[in-house]
């Protein structure tokens, strides 16, 4: 049995109602898991780009891409081999935590403090998914109150 590999697939679609539903139905109907899904319109066009992170054997990934190609609003499917991939995380900390230490840690992970109020500090980091994992592990000592993480975005090199 082949090992499941993490894969990033971009799908260019016509930006119309129910496209996202059809794509997620394709995955769920066949028992494939979507680890991360990000969708945004492509500027100055009537298209959107979906970035899907999934996992599966080579055969499963081939099946997914073939099925995606068959969907009517799909214009292009890109299975990334050599890519730049980023994720973002917003983290809320109590104001009682050390601002300088949090700022230094954020800087090490392509991030910064984006908001400070009387009660909380909000930070943002944007980096490779593994580095976002490391950041989220490293910040535990600052007692984060809330963490929100985006899905992946990717471009072929």
Model-derived segments and spans:
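Long, contiguous binding/interaction regions
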Residues: 1-48, 53-157
């Amino acid at each position: 049995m082949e090992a499941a590999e993490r894969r990033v697939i971009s799908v260019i679609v016509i930006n119309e109602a129910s496209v996202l539903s059809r794509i997620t139905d394709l995955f769920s109907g066949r028992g494939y898991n979507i680890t991360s899904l990000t969708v945004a319109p492509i500027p100055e066009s009537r298209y959107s780009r979906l970035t899907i992170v999934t996992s599966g054997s080579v055969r499963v990934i081939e099946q997914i891409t073939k099925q995606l190609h068959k969907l009517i609003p799909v214009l292009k499917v890109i299975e990334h081999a050599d890519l730049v991939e980023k994720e973002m995380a917003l983290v809320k900390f109590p104001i009682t935590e050390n601002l300088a230490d949090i700022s230094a840690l954020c800087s090490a992970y392509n991030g910064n403090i984006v908001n400070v109020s009387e009660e909380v500090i909000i930070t943002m980091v944007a980096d490779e998914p593994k580095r976002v994992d490391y950041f989220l592990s490293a910040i535990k000592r600052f007692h984060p109150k809330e963490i929100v993480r985006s899905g992946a975005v990717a471009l072929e090199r």
